[in-house]
Swiss-Prot record:
Species in which this protein is naturally found: Nitratidesulfovibrio vulgaris (strain DP4)
InterPro entries linked to this entry: IGPD_sf, ImidazoleglycerolP_deHydtase, ImidazoleglycerP_deHydtase_CS, Ribosomal_Su5_D2-typ_SF
Gene3D superfamilies: Imidazole glycerol phosphate dehydratase, domain 1
Gene Ontology process terms (BP): L-histidine biosynthetic process
Family: Belongs to the imidazoleglycerol-phosphate dehydratase family.
Residues that span the membrane, as ranges: none
Annotated protein name in UniProt: Imidazoleglycerol-phosphate dehydratase
Keywords: Amino-acid biosynthesis, Cytoplasm, Histidine biosynthesis, Lyase
Reaction catalysis annotation: D-erythro-1-(imidazol-4-yl)glycerol 3-phosphate = 3-(imidazol-4-yl)-2-oxopropyl phosphate + H2O
Protein location: Cytoplasm
Length: 198
């Protein structure tokens, strides 16, 4: 039986950012990300690669101010693309969980593509105040925007660690692995006793 490729493209143009992305859920390892913020490029590349997605993403943002608008708008577009590619989410496993170590750091990511947006962000006291020249709260805002646009419950917990890069990398890989589990098709119907995900 041939299945339709789960794929979506999103474009967003505002006074703050210009974004174009294409996301393919059943990917072949083709990830190309250019946002103007190297740490964001790195973390998005890790997430897409570990999820098994193809991702082609470019963003031209107001980086002369800071990376906030770029990170938030990229997350909104990525979440929107995921929600569109999954359509009614029929047949997906829906839930994913991962713990990925990175040297001294360990983060845990749990998610449910339930149609109910929520971000639970724990343990960010382990993150240094500034990472790659940006305040640490940028990463909470990124994940909040992604969870909202993708309509998912997303719990990110930093369990321990010292190096900000390592902590973010642990969480980004964990997000990818959790997404890989959650988008997997393993049934013919919606995994919900109410018959729909919203």
């Amino acid at each position: 039986m041939q299945t339709v490729a789960r794929k979506a493209s999103v474009e967003r143009v505002t006074n703050e950012t210009t974004i174009a992305l294409t996301l393919t859920i059943e990917g072949e390892g083709n990830v190309r990300v250019t946002t103007g913020f190297g740490m964001l490029d790195h973390m998005l590349t890790l997430t897409a690669f570990w999820a098994g997605f193809d991702l082609d993403l470019t963003c031209n943002g107001d980086m002369h101010i800071d990376a906030h608008h770029t990170a938030e708008d990229v997350a909104l577009c990525l979440g929107q693309a995921l929600a569109t590619a999954l359509d009614d989410r029929k047949g997906i496993a829906r839930v994913g969980f991962a713990r990925v170590p990175m040297d001294e750091a360990l983060a845990e990511v749990t998610l449910d593509i339930s149609g109910r947006p929520w971000l639970e962000w724990r343990g960010d006291e382990y993150l240094p105040p500034v990472i790659a020249g940006e305040e640490k709260d940028l990463w909470r805002e990124f994940h909040k925007a992604f969870a909202s646009a993708a309509r998912m419950n997303l719990h990110v917990s930093y369990l321990y660690g010292k190096n900000g890069h390592h902590l973010l990398e642990s969480a980004s890989k964990g997000l990818g692995l959790a997404l890989r589990q959650a988008v997997r098709r393993d049934r013919q119907t919606v995994l919900s006793t109410k018959g729909s995900l919203d």
